[in-house]
Amino acid sequence: MLNFFKNLFDDNAREVKKLQRVVEEINGLEEKIAKLTDEELQGKTAEFKQLLENGKTLNDILPEAFAVCREASKRVLGMRHYDVQLIGGMVLHQGRIAEMRTGEGKTLVATLPVYLNALSGKGVHVITVNDYLATRDSEWMGKLYRFLGLSVGLIVHGIKPEDRRLAYNADITYGTNNEFGFDYLRDNMSLHPEQLVQRELNYSIVDEVDSILIDEARTPLIISGVADKPTHLYYTMAKIVPKLVREVDYTVDEKAHNVLLTEEGVSKAEKLLGIENLYDEANMEINHHLNQSLKAHGLMHRDRDYVVRDGEVVIVDEFTGRLMFGRRYSDGLHQAIEAKEGVKIEKESQTLATITFQNYFRMYNKIAGMTGTALTEEEEFRKIYGLDVVVIPTNKPTIRKDLADLVYKTEMAKFRAVVEDVVQRHETGQPVLVGTISIAKSELLSSLLKRRGVPHQVLNAKHHDKEAEIIAQAGRFKAVTIATNMAGRGTDILLGGNPEVFARAEMRKKGITEENAPAEYQQIVEKYMALCNEERAKVMEKGGLHIIGTERHESRRIDNQLRGRAGRQGDPGSSQFYIALEDDLMRLFGSDNIAGLMDRLGMEEDVPIENALITKSIETAQKRVESRNFSIRKHVLDYDDVMNQQREVIYAQRRKVLTGHNLAENIKDTITAVVERSVDMYCPEGVHEEEWDLAGLLEYAEGLYMPNHNIEPAELEEMGRQGLKDELLERTMSLYQKREEELGAETLREIERIVLLRLVDEKWMDHLDAMDQLREGIGLRAYGSKDPVIEYKFEAYEMFNNMIANIQDDVVRYIFRVNVAAPQERTQRQVVENRYAEEEGKQPIRKENQIGRNDDCPCGSGKKYKKCCGKNA
């Protein structure tokens, strides 16, 4: 094992040494580039573009382009890239992950590969975790890019489609992973080419890459429409479940995240619901609602998993502690929580389009990432995304002291010890940042500190509005800050405080901006700089920022991120974790022997222990959870890869239709496929001609591709299978030609385009639902000694082929029957975005009930109305 790590770090050192040679080349150009005037420096961009047009590669121009970017940064931003930052920039350009410690200037590092790759004109996407960071970085670094003659776009929630299109057409585009992903899905639901906003996915740099590509990898992006399902059952279950007794009527398995009824619970539930058999086929819906309500009451906790804000249940991100507005739990769980909390139940939704971040980001030609902590997840980055991790050396040595964990028997004993530590350090003036894993824990700690009279700031999902401001001042003298998890990532904690944050706050009070009054802003910054420098000296004397972790996270990476908030850029600092045996990680994954050990040692509740066995147990528990989570993500990907291949086929075909690419040929191919399939159905190969159902074939043809024909079965006898196909195809193509003459080629193309797009969208939507149901039940195949993934692939392939056949049938039927004489009324499906949904301008879906949804369709297709014309009526 030691050799493995030795080799790992040797490999890393070799990579860094290799890049050091290019750094020397860049440094050799510095003096020459510094002598250029602003105009000459700006002219370098056009010069580089010309070199690329003449056949040079990005690697050929890298040294000079980096030198130009560094010089422009000195002039525009007042910041010069360190040598280690040049190494980081090269790693990002190579399409790898640069692990850089907190405070090492990741935002500035990104300017180097962003500038270089933007010269190609194909676009660069810089992806951050929230709108605040995207806006901040696009404005801050945008000054540099604009100085060098490049355009900068910003994608944030709520901007109009035309503004999105402009932002994507810029050389460099900033935005969040959610916005980029949803724009991709929306583009693939567009009905007109001018509605498209994204262009080719060329190169992306993902900030906090571990958060986006690992922590959020299991969360699919979903655009959905409202489904027509009643909500009264959720309210019914919300009244019944509290009458069931935990551990008697049902058991809660937190590790497996499941709740199961006992035999007693089943009997009691049947009695309360007034039904004979809960598991009867007729009661499947009731059973499902009861299970979701049990999960809502037994597993989901208010102020940990979600909060209730303005009569709405809002999910809390388990990794960052931020509120996830617009995102909803699926499969009715969110509605069950709404019923439990007594708020209005929003209707369930039907998936219209979906993709995981794993598959979205794998579509880029080149992807790179930055984070402070990636090495622990290198295997996953390499296996799933093909990304290597390179650890970038720090500019100054890290001198932070990481103290040993303190382990307590109970949670309250642990919190009492944390409060004592905070009080003592606060009295000396040392700033303290306390990390908690939930809102409830942060508020408990806050109340304990209030009792002791310690002034402090709380940063959690309930108080996220001033996140950057609070976290930026966490390094001030006597500052005490409580933050859930990794809230505030992306904002540096400067010892003594951040003068620019102070200055911006004062400017806001005066009602002026930095852009409108740059001279006044600079004066205010200088005033606060003197104050902050004075405080910085006092804080340094007290040991710098101290980090307290109140619980070990299930991922070592998250713990390392918390520690990394202290000791930036060679500053002093320290960190320590306080652990209780009642903590979730220890309770669910730690060894039960530890509690017994503490009892045998006769440990008092308030006395901590430092023990190698316990430290090892914590590390083992974390590794087990990390391994389990990786397996889950890999498992999700195994299934999603099947869906992804199908998605790529559908979206590629859809894009061709949208842009009108060879549409008439596409329709002719579709007609051919439908005609040949109909002959294969009614006149199968290997069956004697006398047994062919020619009457059935003609009836089928009339309902599909030859309306009102006057062919008699006798006319088709003795033709043979190929002769039949040729005859029917010739007649159908003749009808199609007449159709084009009647309507005009341009009108028919537009009809074909709209019909194809709508049918593809509707069938794909149904297919997504069917695939979800297949995936839900496929795990049971394992009991029959079959590999569920292989079975899923096989059945998904069959379902996909059936969907394609259904699309072809319906397209042909509509084209031969559609009537454009009367003005058509268009009804737009209400679209609800599961995350960051805009509610303005939405209309409910209208339904006509003249024909029963389960009645045979009057068009004669033989299908039910709901599966045929009822969808498009």
Curated annotation (Swiss-Prot):
Q: Which UniProt keywords apply?
A: ATP-binding, Cell membrane, Cytoplasm, Membrane, Metal-binding, Nucleotide-binding, Protein transport, Translocase, Translocation, Transport, Zinc
- What processes in GO biological process is this protein linked to? intracellular protein transmembrane transport; protein import; protein targeting; protein transport by the Sec complex
Known catalytic reactions: ATP + H2O + cellular proteinSide 1 = ADP + phosphate + cellular proteinSide 2
- Cofactor detail note: May bind 1 zinc ion per subunit.
Topology versus the membrane: Peripheral membrane protein
| Positions annotated to bind Zn(2+) | C857, C859, C868, C869
Family statement drawn from the similarity comment of this UniProt entry: Belongs to the SecA family.
What this protein is called in its record is Protein translocase subunit SecA
Lineage per the UniProt record = Bacteria, Bacillati, Bacillota, Clostridia, Eubacteriales
